[in-house]
Amino acid sequence: MKKHFKFLVVSIAVSLFMANQAGAANTWTEARSDAMGGTGVAAGSYGSGVLINPALLAKAKPDDGITVILPSIGAQISDKDNLRDKIDDISDDVSNYRSTLDNINLIDLLNPSSAASRQVSAAAGDLADQLDSLKGKTASGKAGGGIAVSIPNDVLSVAFVAKANARARVSSYIDQGDIEKLRLVEDVPAAALRINPNDLKSKGFGRAAIVSDYGVAVARQFDISGVPVSVGITPKLQQTWLYNYTVSIYNFDSGDINSSRYRNDDTGFNVDAGLAADFGENWTVGLTGKNLFSRDIDTKEVDGVRDTYQISPVVTAGAAWHTDLLTLTADGDLTETKGFKSEENSQYVGVGAEVTPLSWLAVRAGYRADVKDNDSNVFTAGVGFAPLNTVHIDLMGLYGEDETWGAGAQLSMTF
């Protein structure tokens, strides 16, 4: 089961990639921007603008050609409480406890000094310890991957995009009565005769959401009092898959979270839009709004438990100072990023830098923080390679508090 949990988010990312979709800790994955603290509203390139800010699509230079991103993928996992190992351990302890009960006879069970009775006592104590250690513990992950084709034009630039973002969270409800019953068996093994393991009430929860977008972006640049202002919009079809995995903690298997038994899906329409303006040769400011139409989608009801996933507008402002050698950028969310109603909201700010010492090499770093303090703050870094300025390979990694780590990669080509 440990293997299932450790690769749960990675499996989601792979499935998204196979479906030609994309996504991230934001509502997008783009390796260059992710390496720069998740920024990009003002600093993104025209070829990746459709993933970040559709207005950037209109900022192509005269000699820029068609750009194809195939693919962009990334994943992030946070497990500050080491929950994956604790859940694996409790699975082993449950099996051990049940095994000791199955293999003991009545005479040995009633004799507290027998070896078999002591085994029951020890197994009950181990299980109670594990339950106690699970109280209030959570683990979460985010992932994405996808494609985009951007076609610049002096009149109207166009891009085609398929992107998605995925998030998953594992948590538990530990019933104190379960611990008390197991402590009783630990003290008096014969008490197991009147305690049915199947009647224990503690539960494990797995919530997961995958939101995929399929859209066509259009963008155009205007001259307003000598200031180049770009405007972009992305109408998109939006599909959502929600998973509500609710089971007894003693039967919890994180590999089952994405089973169709716990899945609900929904299809709707949404819009992204953005602005970008250049001030002089070195300054760009941007504003983007993702998912401008709010949507609340209920999960399937499982074991009497239902949750609601919230898709709501996320408005982000950004600024960038750039030269041929150096780019400095900062982004800040003006609205909260919502998810399941059972979870806390986040609101991100990020700063980043890129140094381009050679025409084919870029080195990047950044920092991203949640001002609501509900998600991990992370340091980011990455490199970009562009041999012959035709094939672009971007790699990024992140590490932060609460045992948070992640990685991403992107391959793009220009023609």
Task: Locate each region found by the language model.
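Gram-negative bacterial Sec-dependent N-terminal signal peptides
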Residues: 1-23
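Subset of outer-membrane beta-barrel
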Residues: 25-415
